[in-house]
């Protein structure tokens, strides 16, 4: 039986000119049973793309069918079907006109359509933007280490030059032949070059680099602790516990 068909509870032989009251027409059978978890998940208002939320993938990309978008579709101003619209009554750019009263209770519901039907809305990109900047690429520890490295290189070069000159002077003073002095100078310079090549290169960079890496590590740990602290700073106060009252009663009885 259609729902619009009225059900008359009283006899039809009523007095002429007397109309049926609403309570005489309605019956408990017309009241539907509970629908369970029924929610208003899709809404398309008269304003078109400015008054819509929920899963509108049933349009299959034909967004020009929305009210108020026919002229934009013909002029080519209507955006593509992958654009993500979010109904928010607080934004002035999206709602220049009077928004629908339904949207006041649907701020967190996104407009989903097409390939974005399984995507979740972004969570406060403004607040996380500054946090993500702190996790950028770590700078190389070069500023505080360059003077130390240059000093060590200068010391090694000066040692090599002084050793070669000193050996050359002693060889010229002690020996009378130029061949012996040249051989002594070459042998001494080769021995110094071998010693300098045997020096570990890690000694030049170990201590300054380690201290700078420790600083960068502490900075990253501090930024990460700030982020986790802001995310985990939610505390719920559920009021006094019932266990405290029970313990107080037990103490009084003792």
Swiss-Prot record:
GO terms for biological process: regulation of cell shape. It is found in: Endomembrane system; Cytoplasm, Cytoskeleton. It comes from the Eukaryota. Its main location: membrane. It is a peripheral membrane protein. The keyword Lipid biosynthesis does not apply. Residues 31-45 form the CRIB domain. Residues 165-205 are annotated as: Disordered. The modification Phosphoserine is found at residues 89, 108, 144. Interacts with RHOQ and CDC42, in a GTP-dependent manner, and with SEPT7. PANTHER family: CDC42 EFFECTOR PROTEIN 3, CDC42 EFFECTOR PROTEIN BORG. This is Cdc42 effector protein 3. It comes from Mus musculus (Mouse).
């Amino acid at each position: 039986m259609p729902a619009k068909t009225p059900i008359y509870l009283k006899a039809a032989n009523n007095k002429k000119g007397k109309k049926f009251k609403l309570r005489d027409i309605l019956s408990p059978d017309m009241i539907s049973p509970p629908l369970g978890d029924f929610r208003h998940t899709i809404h398309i208002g008269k304003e078109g793309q400015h008054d819509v939320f929920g899963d509108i993938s049933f349009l299959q990309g034909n967004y020009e069918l929305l009210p108020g978008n026919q002229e934009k579709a013909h002029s080519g101003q209507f955006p593509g079907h992958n654009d993500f619209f979010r109904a928010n009554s607080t934004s002035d750019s999206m709602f220049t006109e009077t928004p629908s009263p339904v949207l006041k209770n649907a701020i967190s519901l996104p407009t989903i359509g097409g390939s974005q039907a399984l995507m979740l809305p972004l969570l406060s990109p403004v607040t996380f933007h500054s946090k993500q900047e702190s996790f950028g690429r770590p700078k190389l520890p070069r500023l505080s280490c360059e003077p130390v490295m240059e000093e060590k290189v200068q010391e090694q070069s000066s040692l090599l030059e002084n050793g070669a000159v000193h050996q050359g002077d002693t060889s010229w003073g002690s020996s009378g032949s130029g061949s012996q002095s040249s051989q002594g100078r070459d042998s001494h310079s080769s021995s110094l070059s071998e010693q300098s090549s045997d020096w570990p290169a890690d000694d030049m960079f170990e201590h300054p680099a380690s201290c700078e890496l420790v600083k960068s590590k502490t900075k990253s740990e501090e930024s990460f602790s700030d982020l986790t602290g802001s995310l985990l700073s939610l505390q719920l106060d559920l009021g006094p516990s019932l266990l405290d009252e029970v313990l107080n009663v037990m103490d009084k009885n003792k």
